[in-house]
Amino acid sequence: STAKDTNPPDSLLFQTLLSEGNTEKALELSEKILEESRNLAERDFEAEAWIRMERALLGAIEPANVGNELRWCVDRLASINPGSPLHGLALLNLASWHRNSNERMMALVTLADISSDAGHPVDLIGLSRLESGRILSLIGDLEPAMRHLWMAMRRLSSSEMSAEAVVCAMEWLDIALDDIDPDSPTMDERILGAKPREKPGMTTIPSNPNDIKESVEIILTNALKDVSGDHRDDLGLILDASEIIEEPKWREAIEERRSEIQDPRLIEVLQS
């Protein structure tokens, strides 16, 4: 084997330093990689875009230039490897930057570019729908927020990101418990029948009790693995759902673990 085979490439070392939290050394190495990359006859444009993205996120460039740098990375990856995991990640990072800059509509537009039609992986599509749902919820546009959170829950469940799927289920349930109607279409039916809208609105929809049950089961299965902790919003939501749709078995499942519960709010509710 050649020396090239036995020595790990600098980009791999860069990744290792990042994962170990050694930011200073990673940034030093990244400057060397970018310098060498510019001098190579065959530049690795994908690695270059990835490293520039990481540098922007780590604060290695002026804050005023971060947005432009992240946009450059998205455009470069879109031209050389559209639909790749790295392209999807670059879009997520750009959307996050827009959201943090209070540019919510730009964040939503950017997140919409992550899709199965574009060839992005299921887990990144799920994460993008979760972010879209959160932004729409913040705006108060709850009908599409609920659809996005539901799609995110389904996508992340199917890609074995169970912790993230639970987060989606919780955020969906928190909205859904405000308005329940047995005659309401299920979320799957709403997603199938969804049509593009000309402009955002402040819409709300009632939820179907069957969807409430599905989301609670996802949350409960995870929550019962360990019920300790001082702030257990997941268990609190389940108790709310148990009362609102009159499903005592969920409360009973939590009551069986009462001695392990530490959240004072839950202890008070369970004593009432």
Describe each region flagged by the PLM.
Residues 31-38, 71-79, 112-119, 150-158, ...:
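Amphipathic alpha-helical segments of tetratricopeptide repeats
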